[in-house]
Amino acid sequence: MTALPGETPGTDDVAAEDVTGGAAADPAPAEAPGAAEDGEAQVQEAGAAAEDPAADATASDATASDGTADATASGGTVDGTTADGTGDASPAPELSEAQAELAAQRELRERIEKRKAEKAAPIAAGTGLSGTAADLLAAVRAVESGEKAGSAFFASPAPAQAPRRPAPAAAQPPRTPAPETTAPAPQAASPEAVAAVRAVLVEGGAPEALARPAVGALGEQAAELLRTDPWQLLAVPGVRPEQADGFARALLGDGCGPDDGRRTAALVGWVLERAALQGHTALDADTVRTALAERAVSDPDAAVREAVEEGVALLFGENEEQEPDDTGAEDGEADGAVSEEDAEAEREPVQLLLGLDRYALAEESLAEGLARLVNACEKAADWAEAAAAAPSPSAAELIRTSAAAGLVVHSGGEAARAEPAALIAAARGLGLRAFGATHSEDGRRRLADAIGDPDTAVTLAGLLSGAQGPGRDEDGALALDLLVVLDAPQLDVESAAVLVEALADGVRLVLSGDPGVLGSAGAGRVFADVLAARACPQVVSRTPDPGPIGELVSGIGIGELNQVDAPGKEVVIVPVRDAGEAVHRTVQLVADSVPRAFSIPAEETQVITVGHGGAAGTRALNEALKQRLNPGPGRFGGFDPGDRVVHVPAPGRAVPGVVRSADAEGLRLDCGGVPVVVPQERVESSVRHGWALSAHQAAGMRWPAAVVVLPGDAAQGLSRPWVYTAFGRGERHLSVVHGVDQALPHAVAQVPAQERTTRLRPLLEALPTPDAAP
């Protein structure tokens, strides 16, 4: 594998430990999806995957193992019959231990559901969602039922909802500047509840600072819950099992032990929550059992069963969604005999998965919603004339495909974003209400420029909240006919479920993105699962990314770190020996070299590094860059006017901005032209300096110049998707501060994307979707 042009081998003295603490045998990105510095005040940084999948699920800085494997028993069903349904013609083979356990767990789940139904009214779909997704779903249903107007969910007066009508062909007048918005804050905890929890924490020897987060996680009854079940403290972000054990011993004395049912149930939930931070929506049951055993649980099998019975987790069989195949009798098995191959297949173990109900409900709701869009769309639309006028063959193919399908997947690099823009413009020319939703404000701006109409581009968060876009129709659904979601790999399963539920029958949905970039910060892999399930037509762009940076990134996408010709110094390699030199050279590049050579000011250059910690992580780099570019005392909670920051209004959303001022209401930011006020109590937890970002934070955005910092101690945190994402953030110039020697080509060639365990793909494959890709 050839090195980058100008690359100089680094020193052999690579640090023994990288910033992630990952094992060399199984390197993974140092930054955990969903734990990107926005939760640093509460959550420890997650690191690379551990070599042992079980240890993976329990270590605070380890990536939970997905345990994914296609263990579906071909031709067999859980109840022991053959796939053709003829199992009654001969003695059925004995159930395997896993199959018997699955059947028993199914019966148990039925009893649990029956008991729940007797105690309370039926639970509406979506109640398993939480956080931003739950808030958005509640807002959608309140509007649908007429209980509240859409404007009730705006922090400031919102524009009146547009009636359902075809979009005018002529360009509309530009919108007035967006009103100042206040960053959403969690529901305030009552002083009484916080005081009660604080008293319990003090009694148990836990830090008083956990009082407010505990009320946020457990609700107003947190004090009572913690007193009766101290291990509920594990629901508070950042709390470790050993800390919860000490808290429980202080409160319960000798009345608790490692096999206490309250403890084991809380541990199961904790393991699954940790896995969700790494993107998994479920875990192999064996992985969970191993994690429990490492936490001194003597009978992990019983602990898992009890957790399922109590509703802490749900149990799934990998092949339980598959329908029996009744073709066997027609193929020579009319006598109903079970073939030896089928009998052997039925004896194969069934992979059992454990998952939290919020992600299970989200994946099931999303799968059903996508199938609804596929089957409800009018497929006889004639967009041939619009396709003929498309600016490229790939754009024409996308237009033709979208005309005949309710769900389409479009994949391509940065230059391929012109194709969804052409589709939106063509659809609006046909009188349809077509919009494009992006992951970031920067992506929204670039899409609006490509379409030529700023009103057609929104951020996904703005669309779902109602702050941007067409508003809702009289039925409470989004008032549109075609929606293109760009940056689709950044779409987590809960947000995707809320989005699809807000789309009416007949709406066309296009998921567009680059499969090579890092996945979503939240749990799930929606874009990859829809691609893998082949449940709808797929359009692969043939438009290459231009220039030396585009050529370099395209090679990385296929595992090759090629030499590229860069006559204009579009790609520059800066070798360094250690982290201290990496920080020094980075500051020099941003403040002097790049502005002088390319006339790109420092505020338009973005630094990207592997993780937040370490001698050359985002914190160290931001401190050095602030001292050089905007020194000051940090009189506004550590910030000064002119500081570049990143605002994290919700986990997984990083919004770059600049500090303008501060007053009694909070810290005032300018986030891509949108004024934002962050309340004082939220500044510490949701605002960080932003001259340097992690690659996850930078996903979905681009800058005129990017400086990627690769210190030697970050070598094991590199992967192909990480390098692909980081190197692709610069539009005109890319500098690589290179101190990882041969770890860079190794990562590109041999460290693919970290797998995530999800259920969306088999759910989609089991649903009837006539438009499935061949």
Q: What is each of the regions a protein language model found here?
A:
Residues 2-70, 74-385, 389-392, 773-774:
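Accessory, non-ATPase domains that flank or precede helicase/AAA+ motor cores in DNA-metabolism machines
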Residues 240, 288, 366, 514, ...:
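Residue-level signature of catalytic and energy-coupling elements of molecular machines
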Residues 342, 346-482, 535, 554, ...:
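ASCE P-loop NTPase motor cores of helicases and related translocases
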Residues 394-406, 419-428, 516-652, 660-662, ...:
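Conserved helicase motor core of P-loop NTPases
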Residues 648-655, 712-714:
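Short, charged beta-turn/beta-strand-edge "cap" motif at the junction between a beta-strand
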